């Protein structure tokens, strides 16, 4: 097979990875292995970094932390050599989330901040917003509310400057939910209510089921704390109906607990 034919095959593998990631772990890993073999044979560092990253991401989704870290560690060096900065930032984000899940807050903080530095240095705005939301959540979960609010507000500011409507709504929704939760944890229910109103006014028309689930969990807690049990029960009923649609509730497990 000539060079052009080989490139076509590799591009097809890469597209298969991008199409199947998060949907079909076995197929994604098979394609990554094909790419890895080809990249090693042809000494293609960029391609090998791509394969290791998406293998690591897939193992993360499978909750296989050992294989995730092994692949991501191999990916980072190669991604740095070949200037794939967004994948590096995403790598640090994945390692941070996994560290949080393992209870290693200090390691998670280091990974988040390193990822944030790459985002700021290379202008990776979308990933920067995600990491700021995650950092804010880490501070919030540990009771450092002022720092949490600072990151949520920075993320909100970035979202406001993003012209893409869909991405803008996703970021805004996350910012509003996180700020509402942060104020609610501090007992500042008037400010919580203000952000719930912003969610309804600015984001509701874009909601998908998973978004409604996040917001309903927030509202149910708020109505419980304000002793509005009729509205609380209505939100809980809506949550039950959405869960019965087989929404992936692990994505919002903390909110449901």
Where are these regions (language model features)?
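Amphipathic coiled-coil alpha-helices
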Residues: 12-13, 31, 52, 71, ...
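Conserved alpha-helical positions within TPR/SEL1-like repeat arrays
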Residues: 14-21, 50-61, 86-101, 126-141, ...
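Solenoidal tandem-repeat scaffolds enriched in leucines and small polar residues
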Residues: 105-108, 115-191, 208-209
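Flexible inter-repeat linkers and adjacent short helices
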Residues: 1-88
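Helix-coil-helix junctions within alpha-helical repeat/solenoid scaffolds
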Residues: 184-257
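Amphipathic alpha-helical segments of tetratricopeptide repeats
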Residues: 33-40, 73-83, 113-124, 153-164, ...
């Amino acid at each position: 097979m000539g060079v052009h034919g080989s490139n076509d095959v590799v591009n097809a593998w890469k597209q298969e990875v991008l199409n199947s990631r998060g949907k079909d772990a076995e197929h994604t890993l098979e394609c990554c292995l094909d790419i890895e073999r080809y990249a090693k044979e042809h000494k293609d560092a960029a391609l090998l970094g791509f394969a290791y990253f998406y293998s690591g991401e897939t193992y993360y989704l499978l909750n296989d932390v050992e294989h995730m870290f092994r692949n991501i560690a191999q990916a980072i060096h190669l991604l740095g050599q070949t200037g794939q900065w967004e994948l590096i930032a995403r790598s640090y984000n994945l390692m941070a989330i996994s560290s949080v899940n393992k209870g290693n807050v200090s390691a998670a903080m280091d990974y988040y901040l390193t990822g944030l530095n790459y985002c700021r240095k290379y202008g990776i705005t979308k990933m920067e917003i995600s990491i700021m939301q995650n950092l804010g959540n880490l501070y919030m979960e540990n009771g450092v509310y002022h720092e949490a609010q600072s990151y949520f507000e920075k993320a909100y500011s970035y979202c406001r400057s993003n012209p893409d409507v869909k991405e803008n709504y996703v970021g805004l929704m996350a910012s509003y939910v996180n700020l509402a939760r942060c104020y609610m944890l501090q007992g500042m229910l008037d400010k919580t209510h203000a952000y719930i109103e912003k969610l309804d006014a600015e984001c509701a028309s874009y909601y998908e089921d998973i978004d409604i689930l996040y917001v309903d969990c927030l509202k149910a807690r708020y109505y419980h704390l304000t002793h509005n049990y009729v509205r609380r029960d209505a939100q809980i009923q809506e949550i039950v109906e959405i869960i019965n649609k087989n929404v992936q509730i692990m994505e919002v497990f903390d909110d449901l607990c």
